[in-house]
Amino acid sequence: MAYHGRGDGYDGHQLQDLPGGHNQGDQHDDAQAPFLSENPMPYDNDRLGTDTPPVRPVSAYSLTESYAPGAGTTRAGVAVNPTPPPHGGYGGGGVSSGVDQGYNYGGDYATDPAYRMSAIDEDDSWLRRQQPNAAPTGGLKRYATRKVKLVQGSVLSLDYPVPSAIRNAVQPKYRDEEGNNEEFFKMRYTAATCDPNDFTLKNGYDLRPRMYNRHTELLIAITYYNEDKVLLSRTLHSVMTNIRDIVNLKKSSFWNRGGPAWQKIVVCLVFDGLDKTDKNVLDVLATIGVYQDGVIKKDVDGKETVAHIFEYTSQLSVTPNQALIRPVDDGPQTLPPVQFIFCLKQKNTKKINSHRWLFNAFGRILNPEVCILLDAGTKPSPRSLLALWEGFYNDKDLGGACGEIHAMLGKGGKKLLNPLVAVQNFEYKISNILDKPLESAFGYVSVLPGAFSAYRFRAIMGRPLEQYFHGDHTLSKLLGKKGIEGMNIFKKNMFLAEDRILCFELVAKAGQKWHLSYIKAAKGETDVPEGAPEFISQRRRWLNGSFAASLYSLMHFGRMYKSGHNIVRMFFFHVQLIYNIANVIFTWFSLASYWLTTTVIMDLVGTPVTASSSSAEHHGWPFGDTVTPFFNAVLKYIYLAFVILQFILALGNRPKGSKWTYITSFFVFSLIQSYILVLSGYLVARAFSVPLDQQLQLDNAKDAMASLFGGSGSAGVILVALVTIYGLYFLASFMYLDPWHMFHSFPYYMLLMSTYINILMIYAFNNWHDVSWGTKGSDKAEALPSANVSKGEKDEAVVEEIEKPQEDIDQQFEATVRRALAPYKEDETPEPKDLEDSYKSFRTMLVVSWLFSNCLLAVVITSDNFNTFGIGQTASARTAWFFKFLLFATGALSVIRFIGFCWFLGRTGIMCCFARR
């Protein structure tokens, strides 16, 4: 039966709107007591100062909750505004749309002893609250107990009443007061003591959406590691508003058929370990009803719990600025019910294992059509999740898709003042404008970022997921040599970019013709590293993982022939193969290419040349014939010295331990690059100082090409470089209707682009051995209560469970909400040192081969001592040819990207006219 609360007339907490403003001290009666409390608290009267306006950010909405029964009258179960206290009471009227500013939810967190202790010893406080007989006011309390039968004698699955405030927040039209549906009145907890592969109906495990016979069309997964409550709230609230966009569709031929749209959507949160979880985040989840303290069990009858699974359907949400939102009316801004599954893993077993819980455990029971993957901190824009789903709905062969990820720039773009943020913003933008559309045109997007991507569930079932989960450390014993422990260092690095492996396996799936696509209308916003150490550490994993995964896809390209793709698609896959091989080669030799480009430009501009029959006279620029060559030589030595320094730092230091040295390196390379840009501008001006018609021989096409690109002609080479490298960036950005990054981020990128090779790639390759795998146990889990099994009256397995009265549940909820809505204070505790000392021999061989091949290329190009090997050209001639080849090859790759972008843009514009709605 549905839960109806107590039978003595206790109605619990009533959610109600209170006008926004500040506290008036004691100028209110008992019926209008602050927040949830009947009794005076030390932080009530003086938490903000009498008649002092709050300092918390003010939302456009208002929601508070009164513990005093009858505080405000109710109508059909929905609380309405009480009469304001005298003199304006709580302040000026807030808009009654369902959000609370948050400042009425607690005290002065900087001075309150209770909250100061909580901030210092947060984890210990959380552990004390997990004891079943913990009283809301502290200490222990004796409670009545109930005996609960285990499912199939081994599975612990219990229903717990939610706080009255959460129950009363549900709109009446969704309540099933007389039926058996308890999803709004009780939270369901399951202690999973099995591997994700064994989380099956056969073994006694189940999930509410399937129990209610609901079809799951969309499974939205949020993976979490150690993000703070602001980052999680940003993602979670954006997801709920996106679900509201879907529910509000009026003319949908799908979502409005066969039941309410919200019943076809499930949000799954997977947290990677108790130790790493920010306990303030759990308070946020408890505030919306998805989690409760004092519920989890570390083991069931001695069998260790692997994952704690909570289920609840909520209409509440917490915004990133700690404002609580609840439904007020049936307007379009009201959040619909959202079905939540919260999986809190007991141990930190990495992201791949979190995805195994998602796909192999929950996915097989719910059998969704589309799974959307988000990282905590990613903020999907309005209607973005709908746009991702529509891509699958309109293309039956679409196996995976991703949207546009862009950097979070702060209010007014203030973060763009940080060069690292601006560089990453430009990188994201160009990837979204040129790279992703090109790969989408081919049908194989090399990486669908795990922070914002989607897959068709039946497309990834089978071999794609099997190969993907080979990187899960918890399967190492089961898989043997195929598992992570049996892999060489190359394969381990490959799984640092595991999403690339899944993409390739999906497209190459035998007998199938799944393809991948980029969906422009879906946009997500994410934080990017703002400091040099964080930036370098992130790119170490990205560069090593993507390089290994790229080689994997090239070496296993033959498996494409076993797929079901048609001949046209296969032709474009071969074109993409050649394009990817070229990119890998250019990436490998990029260290030498940047050095040669730098020295060639310095020599072309700074070396004085006397007039002769083959060349015109020019002087060293910008400091004259004597100073310029000397200045350039000094810069070359500085350049080489800092490159060598990067090897020393990468082999012996962590970025966080050499922060200022790395910052200095970024600064020095940017100064050298700025000097090269000035010299390049001078080269362009000098090349076009003679009118173009005088440089060209237009007698015939052959002579015209020879005068433009051959011999001593430099105008043609420079013209090609300007158009293909820089011109296409501007043209594509304007065609994409998003050109602003070319003005505020492109200049930073021009200054720092050499650091991508000279700092980031050097650090990445020198730390090839650093793969952070393995399972880390949970120290906190040892202090959690156990579920002891005994025999019941009919000899069945039962567990004795504490049964708290509703008053205690509600009183505990008071403190939870205060903690959840407290102002966020950033944790500045330094991270512990984490070093991996294995596989250094492989790293050494990799670095030696990479460094030797790049040095060999540089020496061959710039040295005159190779005549004995049959190389008759002088070093200056070889340098000129290499420089031309480099510019032409780079230009050709840019043209290919631009063609792919044009095809994608045209196809997207045409197909949107025929897409089903």
Swiss-Prot record:
Its EC number is 2.4.1.16. Residues 1-11 have a biased composition (Basic and acidic residues). Residues 1-570, 651-664, 738-744, 865-884 are extracellular. The chain crosses the membrane at residues 571-591, 630-650, 665-685, 717-737, 745-765, 844-864, 885-905. One of its GO terms (biological process) is chitin biosynthetic process. Residues 1-56 are annotated as: Disordered. Keywords: Cell membrane, Cell wall biogenesis/degradation, Glycoprotein, Glycosyltransferase, Membrane, Transferase, Transmembrane, Transmembrane helix. It is a multi-pass membrane protein. GO terms for molecular function: chitin synthase activity. Residues 592-629, 686-716, 766-843, 906-917 are cytoplasmic. It comes from the Eukaryota. It catalyses: [(1->4)-N-acetyl-beta-D-glucosaminyl](n) + UDP-N-acetyl-alpha-D-glucosamine = [(1->4)-N-acetyl-beta-D-glucosaminyl](n+1) + UDP + H(+). Pfam families: Chitin_synth_1, Chitin_synth_1N. GO terms for cellular component: cell periphery; cell septum; plasma membrane. Glycans are attached at residue 544. It is found in: Cell membrane. Belongs to the chitin synthase family. Class III subfamily. Polymerizes chitin, a structural polymer of the cell wall and septum, by transferring the sugar moiety of UDP-GlcNAc to the non-reducing end of the growing chitin polymer. This is Chitin synthase 1. It comes from Neurospora crassa (strain ATCC 24698 / 74-OR23-1A / CBS 708.71 / DSM 1257 / FGSC 987).
